[in-house]
Amino acid sequence: MQNISINIEKKEFFNYENKIKTHIAIKNFNLEIAKGEFCSIIGPSGCGKTTLLNLIAGLDKTYTGSISFGKNKAVHNLNKAFMFQTPRLLPWLNVQQNVEVVLNKNQNKNEISKKFLSIMGLEKFLDYYPNKLSGGMQRRVALARSFATQPQLLILDEPFTSLDEPVANLLRKMLLELWAKQPTTIIFVTHDINEAIYLSDKIVFLSKPPSKVLKEININTKRPRKMDNNTIQKIKNKILEANNSILEGEL
């Protein structure tokens, strides 16, 4: 897989009863994401981050422009995996079955599910049902499920929101460990610039709607990272001192 090229001329919403344009969500949006890159996206509330993910995933094709990888192929044809703000586990399936459900019949479901659940420290919880797990453990299952399909593109939409900070930090570390074992291209939406600095190769800051790319900032700290809070704060301060309104979607 080559770079992902995102070139959205316009994404607008209509009232289809009277065909009146109601909202231009994204306009003149141009972004390149390299193969294997961890790219975080930050923007003000309501700027169209989830809309952007839906376009990239091919869930919404009503826009002008192109989203492709390589020369001719559409990104929506890639093998993709998703992780959302909630784990979205199936309550009638146990932990192992929740991972196996996304695998195809030609794969060794038992071996693959146990492998990824073991990486997440859940080997003793294979027969537990979601309602017996904490929120953090449910998200570990969701992470294992996301990587089990060996996706070419992994899309994460604020996956660690609402968690206590120690639990969220553990999951961020586990995400990076999984990614190191099975590299893939990641698009990660977050409101937390500290989280983005810790995880990302590149942070993309979006404007107020209609959304476009305001600025791309590379995080060049070598991996595996051992970034304490002071290190993250120094990088954050450097970014915000040069771009003091960037989190509000302005330069």
Predicted regions and their residues:
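Conserved signature/switch motifs of ABC ATPase nucleotide-binding domains
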Residues: 128-131, 149
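Catalytic Walker B motif of ABC-type/P-loop ATPase nucleotide-binding domains
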Residues: 154-157
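Helix-to-loop junction immediately C-terminal to a conserved catalytic motif
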Residues: 57
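Conserved ABC transporter NBD signature motif
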Residues: 64-76
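The feature captures the beta-strand-to-loop junction immediately N-terminal to the Walker
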Residues: 42-44
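Hydrophobic anchor residue at the start of the ABC signature
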Residues: 143
